[in-house]
C-alpha cells in the first residue's frame, strides 16, 4: 500500500507516520509511506506513481490542501483522500473532492 502524507509541519508528518506504521505493522500490512512538505512536490510524485491513500493537510504554506486535492482529482480519481486538519471549516469542500474522511489532528490525541 502506497501512502502519502502531505503537511508543511514536519512534526505532524512524523506523528502521523508513526501512528500509521504502528497500526499497519500490527496487522502485518506492508506499506510504503512517503512524506511531502507541500502540495506541489506531492503532485509531481503522484503523477509519476499514484498513491493508494493520501493524508492531506488543508492549511499549508503555498497551495492549500483543497487546491491540491482538486488538482489531484484531475489525474487520480481512485485514491482514498483523507484531510488532516485542526478545523472542520472546510468539510463541505472536502466532500466536493471526494475526500472520504475529515480527520482532525486534535481527535488523534484523545
Identify the meaning behind each predicted range.
Residues 7, 57-58:
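Active-site residues of response regulator receiver
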Residues 35-53:
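Acidic, metal-coordinating helix/loop segments flanking the phosphotransfer/catalytic sites
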Residues 9-34:
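Two-component/phosphorelay signaling modules centered on CheY-like receiver
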Residues 57, 78-88:
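A short, hydrophobic beta-strand element within the central beta-sheet of small alpha/beta folds
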Residues 103-109:
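Conserved small/polar residues in nucleotide/adenosyl-binding loops
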Residues 61:
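The feature encodes the CheY-like receiver
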Residues 38, 64-67:
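Acidic catalytic/metal-coordinating carboxylates
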